């Protein structure tokens, strides 16, 4: 039997909150019956929803607050005025040790700002990174950063590589995950100074990383490497492009099979294969972006997801807790200290 885990939930975060959030917790409970939830939000709206799902009433504790963070709120505004919001209180529960991780479908910028302010960074890490899974022809690939840091230096990229490598080993169970740096070409002379310096640091360092080298955009879904490292500007564009491509592909298929009576008849034969493809590319299955590098587990669900997607985000948080991701990151960076060369010193030396 799995050990009990407590997750704090920003019940008011997301386009369809709190309905989507509570139903998502119900779906997560079916797969993760050992998890308990601290739900932060408006009790007058959450209680009726829990009454609809009595099977989770016993594992949910409501912490009432009437304040929430809007999707339009600026992070700086939330840091000044949002300390009684459902998002802030949910993050604070992790900092106080009341919960092992927090999940929110709310404002991404605000969640990152609040998480950094309340949880702080793990020792030895300069910046957090948003990480997520991409479907590939070979399975899945972890990619980071997906939007936390628009500008990155070589030090940041090296740290992201270490965090991604530890995640791939600890959570994905890969014995020796391969790491690739996203670039405009695979040749050594291509790319900006930060990318080239990070590549040199990873190649020449004592770090226990299987560095593949540079990868290009088409390598992400090709499954060329297990972990793709990039800055948040490029990573977020890649993520949104992939999401848009899936929607475009689905639209083309729908239009094609509705174009004629013969096409509709053909769909009957192809339906099973098409549904398998839809399942593999369903963005809800990969919902749950991880804020790696924080001194606490924080997972961001897509704001427009449904209950199924939110349940998957909860699952991501539980996996991080269960596999002791943050403890492993601490040990990894502590282990680097005796060599008297930290990732930041390595990258700085190549700039």
Curated annotation (Swiss-Prot):
Metabolic or biological pathway: Lipid metabolism; phospholipid metabolism
GO biological process, one term: fatty acid biosynthetic process
Domain of life: Bacteria
Residues forming coiled coils: none
Keyword entries, A-Z: Cytoplasm, Lipid biosynthesis, Lipid metabolism, Phospholipid biosynthesis, Phospholipid metabolism, Transferase
Subcellular location: Cytoplasm
Lipid metabolism keyword on record: yes
A molecular function GO annotation: phosphate:acyl-[acyl carrier protein] acyltransferase activity
Record's GO cellular component terms: cytoplasm
EC number: 2.3.1.274
Catalytic activity: a fatty acyl-[ACP] + phosphate = an acyl phosphate + holo-[ACP]
Keyword Transferase: yes
Gene3D superfamilies the UniProt entry points to: Isopropylmalate Dehydrogenase
NCBIfam families assigned to the protein according to its UniProt record, in alphabetical order: plsX
Family designation: Belongs to the PlsX family.
Assembly notes: Homodimer. Probably interacts with PlsY.
HAMAP family assigned to the protein according to its UniProt record, in alphabetical order: PlsX (MF_00019)
Function: Catalyzes the reversible formation of acyl-phosphate (acyl-PO(4)) from acyl-[acyl-carrier-protein] (acyl-ACP). This enzyme utilizes acyl-ACP as fatty acyl donor, but not acyl-CoA.
Listed name of the protein: Phosphate acyltransferase
